[in-house]
Amino acid sequence: MKHLKRITAIVLALVIMAGAFILPTSAAAQERGASDGEKVVRMYFGHRPRYAYLSGHTWLYFENLTNHDVQVGLYTVKPGKGVSVGSYGYDIEDGRGVYYNVEAHRYNSAKVNDYVYLSTEITEKQLERVSEKILLSGTWFYMLNCSYFAITTWDVVSKPFLMYMVIPTFVHLQVIMNPNHGTGFKMYYPSRSEVFKQVGRGDNARLEPANPDSTGRMI
């Protein structure tokens, strides 16, 4: 029991330290992201708790608001449609990394909407910065998990600022404590052929077909 308390204290200390480093960078990014241009995408920050809030999954969803194609990372989104983007560790057959449309396919297939969210509308320039962040992502381990990917990508341009919390319970609390949060937003239902894994980073990144099915292991 003493060891568990000590481990918990260490994790909380690391979370606070990470937040202290991320905050100045994210605040500056928000200032750079301020723009009165046309909003081209509605970006959602989604969190679905699991196992009595002890675990969960966090991801982003991008809805095209225009009458033309928009680019989210490596994925082209048609007018009126959207794409989910999330980082996975173990609950995926094709290995750790960033995936497109896994959440949208899984949650539509299972007909579940027990997730909470925040949303914001962003301009084309802001979307370009978000896409750059996605293309540079791909690493997954316990301290840099799905929450880390979603929060640090959201914070590139969006308000409210979200502090990275490795513990799913704290991610959930950050969302529901915001008076503008919602529950169960609708996502475009992609076919299995529209699910991809991002392989490589930056200019070397590419898409490969991926299996959206869950392995049953914790995310």
Identify what each model region corresponds to:
Residues Q30-S35, V112, T120-E132, T215-M218:
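Post-signal peptide N-terminal regions of Sec-secreted extracellular proteins
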Residues R48-P49, N113-S119, E132-F141:
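Second-shell loop/turn segments in exported
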Residues R129-I219:
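Activation targets extended, charge/polar-rich intrinsically disordered C-terminal tails
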Residues A52-S55, T120-L127, T139-S147:
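Solvent-exposed, acidic/flexible segments
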Residues L12-F21:
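Hydrophobic core
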Residues A20-R32:
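Sec-dependent signal peptide cleavage junction
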Residues M1-V11:
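Bacterial N-terminal signal peptides that target proteins for export
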Residues R32-V112:
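Glycine-rich catalytic cores of cysteine/serine-nucleophile enzymes that process amide/ester linkages
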